[in-house]
Amino acid sequence: MYDATTPSDPPEPSGTPAYRTAGSYTLPEVCGRFVAASASRGRTAATAGAGVLTDMMQFTLRHTDTRTEARAGELATDHGVIRTPIFMPVGTAAAVKGIFHRDVRDEAGAEIILANTYHLYLRPGTKILEEAGGVHRFSTWEGPMLTDSGGFQVFSLADCRKLREEGCHFRSHIDGSKHLFTPESVIDTERAIGADIMMAFDECPPGDAPREYAAKSLALTERWLDRCFERYAQTQPRYGHYQALFPIVQGCGYPDLRARAAENVRQYDADGYAIGGLAVGEPTEVMYRMIEVVNAILPADRPRYLMGVGTPTNILEAIERGVDMFDCVMPTRNGRNGQLFTWEGTTFDRRYSKAYLHHLVTCGEMMAAQIASLHNIAFYLRLVRAAREHILAGDFKEWKEAAVAKLGRRL
């Protein structure tokens, strides 16, 4: 058994392995079943409930900056088109904390939100989500949605989880009940939730993990990834819209492990690719270097998603390095704690003075968290929209350098 409190010994297959060990497979072995299933899916459009499914998610690059790797594109889903670069507000339990969906969409301008498989699995559970017709109908969010697989949440539960080859045993943070996540069960759960973009199940090791731990953890993630895509190919969407599956690149702060992981995931010919395991304790310069290593290998014609990052400066630096999609709890979490992100002190909603906002925060009024959270999400979305405009205009580099200089100031 792999105990999270003893990170030197991740599990490895023993005897005759049920799943391939990392490095022992060839491209046809890893991808043959998935590629064949993908081709079949493309030839015969599956139907489920309301309509006919598209056979894949379409990503169109509109412009790539000539002096950086920054890109402007469009990602077409069955629930709408997402203009990239994009920030995805985090709605862990299918709700962005403290804000109405209409305000997230209409006031802040969100085009896609993120929910979490781990939390939705525990509450309300897949049975209720299935009876409701999926997370879109359940939550009344009509736009695109992405679900994280729960790998990071499992990483966060270090004191109450254990990893094995089959998957992850953990105790609920709610009531202490015992559960098991496997690559197969996570895909089944994400199918039941019904988000437009699903994430593969992975292990997210600490950013400063020793190399031996990082290598064994990556090998486990790669074996799990093969099982995720096999299950994905065996199942169909349930609610009449296409669901993409993004693999996740791990490897901590080791360039060779990151490169190996990127080479491995690109073999799946997925609709998009995610970079995980960053902003989890490693120095910022290491994070930027890992993004560069990975993006040099990932296909240029697919969206790249940097998971859980980050500050406004982090986002602009990552856009410069070729990242298209972001999520982070920082806008809402910091908003609930009275911190606002601004351009030189200007607030998003000018109906409220800064004096009044300060008053609400010091009084502990619920309205303070709501206004501040909406303001911060609007700030993040305006930031990535501005980045997109300057990429298209051809002056992204100059604008980004000036913006980063301003973003580092505290008012």
PLM regions and their residue ranges:
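Intrinsic, low-complexity polybasic segments
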Residues: 8, 17, 37-38
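Non-catalytic, usually N-terminal nucleic-acid engagement modules in DNA/RNA processing proteins
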Residues: 54-238, 361-362
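Conserved, mostly hydrophobic/aromatic
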Residues: 80, 113, 148, 190, ...
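Glycine-rich phosphate/ribose-binding loops and adjacent secondary-structure elements
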Residues: 219-222, 231, 235, 242-351
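Gly/Ser/Thr/Ala-enriched C-terminal appendages of enzymes
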Residues: 329-385
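Radical SAM enzyme core and accessory elements
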Residues: 383-411
